[in-house]
Amino acid sequence: MDYCKQLSLVSDRLLKDYDVIIDTNTVIKNKKHVGVLPDYAHAAYHAFYGQIKEVNIKWLNFKFEKLPNVCGKINILPAEKVFSDWEGIVWFKGIPETYHLKDFKVLDFFVNEACVGFYNIEGKTEELHYLYFEEEPVPLGINLEGYCQLLSLSYGFFYWQSAIVELITKKKSQESKDFKRYMPKLFSDFSYPQFVEVYNQVRIKKT
């Protein structure tokens, strides 16, 4: 996948929308591969960080300025940050050595209280999980390539990942409701049925 092209489509689309107010719009390309990824990391991470260093996009729409949750945030971290120690944020001192979140790495730190990440364990790095801090991670059934494809449809709408969580768990949330309600009003080219269709196409096939 051409990750630079995929994520630049998001950036370019936002720049063309006169109703969108862009706070941050950064897609930093990598000139060489970052050597901090473990060899066993899924191929998608090696491909991604061979092209892109980090992505930080924040936007809102002036028609909905009074609704703080009607906005977009993407914050895909540099590889050296992703594969660093997340003690004090994801997990804390005093927990058992076997605590599974010690192996959890944050990829898209889109808001202070939640993120999308993965388990840095050989054979388990492919699938991304949604983590609302102090709760258990929810497997999203997609890898980094699928995540970027869905980002290009959702434009990083605030908590857009909750729509996937709803599809998986059948549990409704205000965030998912906002996504389905406001995205068609913000972007005329957005279609929730198409979003679901693409999600089903990029889901990891379980064997």
PLM-predicted stretches and their roles:
Residues 1, 7, 141-145, 157, ...:
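Alpha-helix initiation and N-capping motif
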Residues 1-114, 205-207:
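A surface-exposed partner-binding patch
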Residues 3, 133-136, 172:
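Generic alpha-helical structural element
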Residues 20-30, 62, 157-169, 196:
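Short glycine-rich, low-complexity/disordered patches
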Residues 101, 123-126:
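A short, compositionally biased
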Residues 114-121:
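Short, surface-exposed beta-strand/loop micro-motifs that present aromatic residues
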Residues 127-161:
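Compact, glycine/acidic-enriched structural inserts
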Residues 167-207:
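Charge-dense, low-complexity intrinsically disordered regions
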